[in-house]
Amino acid sequence: MDIRQVRETIEMIEEQNFDIRTITMGISLLDCIDSDIDKAAEKVYTKIVTKAKNLVAVGDEIAAELGIPIVNKRVSVTPIALIGAATDATDYLPLAHALDKAAHEIGIDFIGGFSALAQKGYQKGDEILINSIPQALAQTSKVCSSVNIGSTKTGINMTAVRDMGRIIKETAEASDMGAAKLVVFANAVEDNPFMAGAFHGVGEADVVINVGVSGPGVVKRALEKVRGESFDVVAETVKKTAFKITRIGQLVGNMASERLGVKFGIVDLSLAPTPAVGDSVARVLEEMGLETVGTHGTTAALALLNDAVKKGGVMACNQVGGLSGAFIPVSEDEGMIAAVQNGSLNLEKLEAMTAICSVGLDMIAIPETTPAETIAAMIADEAAIGVINQKTTAVRIIPLGKEGDMIEFGGLLGTAPVMKVNQASSVDFINRGGQIPAPIHSFKN
């Protein structure tokens, strides 16, 4: 590495808010299954604190050694619905408490995997877990939850969609922060390092390390140098910048897996914003020539950004995965917040952008009076985009306050303006239940 590259890396960290967003250790809990829920909870706690006891120390050590901030150290586990199903318990709160206790013990930021995979129907554990979510998130501080309700191969479980509309409402009523730690997916991935949607897939190794990077500020600074140039130049600039960002992610992942003695999984090629000025995906899109995010051209700008990030990132590491794209959470991105406040960005435009971006309707506050069926219909729309386009989509909606209020979450979760929601009813549509069949192009065999 020559002196120019060293200087570039220092600038990325000091001036452009570059960091490693997360080192996430995925841990399989399949060997913790027990017919007694208290015994299962004890096994879960023991395995997590044994496998991840050095995660925080190693993360801090690497950060100090390289001079690169590693913002979060996290753990993801096997979907708890699979562990709980072996018991006769009527709720899975003991397992949620075991996860939270383990997370506090090892000093991590979040633990994901209070999850269910219900894309084609409910097994016993799925329904129990889903109904446990509101209290599980209210009674814990570090546990994150997710439910997969659809996939391109199976279609959309509309019964689960209906139930999740209700659960999101109940979760927001049980605790202010609960709904911010709950994601509803279509086409959920098994190696996602980002919260709140991370869980450790059943096809994964026993323990793996996955890395998520963050660098919208770096991309924006690079684009400032090519103002007025053609889109060919813009795409190439983003690609080269994404390569540099991801290369550092690969290095950190290799070092962490080596020192922890576990397998290295993937680098997630996502641009993840924070509420800090200079760390915004929205401002990257505006740098391409948009007056404000939400105006016409926004979806095209996002498409270019997403694709170029992937092309550059793939060259930089041997295993990529997770969600891999650009995140567009409202509360976690100061540019998105500004666009909502000035009226240029609404829910309908956000939905269009989710056909392109890394996930979906993310960290969006809506009025607390919004009916559960309307929330379920938002989930159904997002799931349809994901299922038809063979991509991951998700909903992390927070029904709090009234339209125009500002909801303060703090930290990386930021601040969310409460957005206007269409008032027309979707009740009869949602109450049908059943399964929307898989699309015709899903039959590949």
From Swiss-Prot:
Assigned protein family: Belongs to the UPF0210 family.
Q: What name is this protein filed under?
A: UPF0210 protein SSU05_0296
Q: Which PANTHER family match?
A: UPF0210 PROTEIN MJ1665, UPF0210 PROTEIN SPR0218
Q: What interactions and quaternary structure are annotated?
A: Homodimer.
The set of disulfide-linked cysteines is none
Return the HAMAP family for the record. Answer: UPF0210
Q: Which Pfam families match?
A: DUF711
Give the domain of life.
Bacteria
Upper taxonomic lineage: Bacteria, Bacillati, Bacillota, Bacilli, Lactobacillales
**What NCBIfam families would the database entry show?**
PRK05313.1 (NF003700)
Which chain positions lie within coiled-coil regions?
none
